Amino acid sequence: EQMTKIPRESGNEAAISEYLVNFAKEHNLDYVQEPCKNVIITKPATPGYEDAPRVILQGHMDMVCVKDDELDFNFETDALPIYVDGDWLRTKGTTLGADNGIAVAMSLAILADETLEHPALTVLVTTEEETGMDGVMALDPANVPGDILINIDSEEEGVALASCAGGV
């Protein structure tokens, strides 16, 4: 819900990038914020998982920005008009930003949960995916330690792809 209050149109990711940096600081996690505003957050393995392969959870912070024509809304400055409908989070006349806010929210929830047992984790959140993969193209691989990468940006719920280059 907090992320829906931060405008994050492609090319306008400075505020959401800072939000991620502040999250890392608040949780005493190591992080790197790249010049292109990509954010990489790392968390050590829990006891017993130190020798397991490091997992990278990857998503992007920008969102598809579409609204109803008659709606007075500015994606560069306005918080999304969200509301709860039963078990669903919805908006009034705009896209929700679940592409790919869901990856960011899931990754932050995993990082914040002190009860989960896990290997060393790297959370990679890139910029400008919706307009040309600019964040990925500017990424410094030296900033992204890991052995297994899970990209959390799928078109279908419950479907996983292995060894897929996607849009690259």
Which residues are covered by each model-predicted region?
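Acidic/His- and Gly-rich active-site-bordering loop/insert found
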Residues: 1-87
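Short Gly/Pro-enriched turn/cap motifs at secondary-structure boundaries
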Residues: 31, 162-165
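Short acidic loop-to-helix transition motifs that present clustered carboxylates
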Residues: 36-40, 130-132, 157
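A generic local structural motif
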Residues: 27, 42-44, 110, 135-138
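Metal-dependent catalytic neighborhoods of phosphoester/phosphodiester hydrolases
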Residues: 14, 133, 150
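Active-site metal-coordination/substrate-binding segment of hydrolases
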Residues: 49-125, 129-131, 137-147
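A glycine-rich helix N-cap at a beta->alpha junction
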Residues: 139-162
